[in-house]
Swiss-Prot record:
BP GO terms, sorted: dimethylallyl diphosphate biosynthetic process; isoprenoid biosynthetic process
Gene3D superfamilies: Nucleoside Triphosphate Pyrophosphohydrolase
Protein name: Isopentenyl-diphosphate Delta-isomerase
Native organism taxonomy: Bacteria, Bacillati, Actinomycetota, Actinomycetes, Micrococcales
Source organism of the structure: Paenarthrobacter aurescens (strain TC1)
One Pfam family matching this protein: NUDIX
């Protein structure tokens, strides 16, 4: 990735108001900015979870959705998703579908770093064999939505806060099959 990866800053209405270096926006007083989350689904309806690298600035070592990122200024979401799928997981994303267009959250990690994002949520498929970038992904697993729901209920602290907030909304929107084996 570029050493000067930029993110889009937003006002409270979600309107772009500027840009800033990604490295400088995740602080104790993070400004609202644009991001995305993507959930990869395999042919039997399982969701790819990834465990964040211990090198990550926010929520290191926790399990989360397949991958996340920030579209750069002027970059389309689909292009950002393709870029991050390749960078984080070494695969090409396809069949990209916007499922939660208005998701927004603010969360504070144990070190005090704030996430403050307008973060549309997508589901997609992949082609190729996973080849995770160890600077981004410490581990990964395909899991049924039913098992994920159970894990979130019993061990919520093992997961990123955005996964905990997004997952019930994904189920409500019928974006994920609750039973593995169901065609996604």
């Amino acid at each position: 990735m570029n050493a000067t990866e930029m993110v889009v800053l937003l006002d409270d209405a979600g309107t772009p108001i500027g840009e800033a270096p990604k490295a400088g926006v995740h602080t104790l007083d993070t400004p609202l900015h644009l991001a995305f989350s993507c959930y990869l689904i395999n042919d039997v309806g399982e969701v790819l979870l990834t465990r964040r690298s211990p090198e990550k600035k926010t929520w290191p070592g926790v399990w989360t959705n397949s991958f996340c990122g920030h579209p750069g200024p002027g970059e389309e979401f689909e292009d950002a998703i393709l870029r991050r799928a390749q960078f984080e997981l070494g695969v090409d994303a396809n069949k990209i579908e916007l499922v939660l267009p208005h998701f927004r959250y603010r969360a504070i990690d144990p070190t005090g770093i704030v996430e403050n994002e307008v973060c549309p949520v997508y589901v997609a498929r992949i082609t190729g064999v996973l080849n995770p970038n160890p600077a981004e992904v410490a581990d990964w697993a395909w899991i049924s939505p039913a098992l994920l729901a159970d894990a979130l209920e019993h061990t919520p602290s093992a997961f990123s806060p955005w996964l905990g907030l997004q997952f019930p909304q994904l189920l409500e929107a019928n974006a994920l099959p609750l039973q593995a084996g169901a065609e996604a």
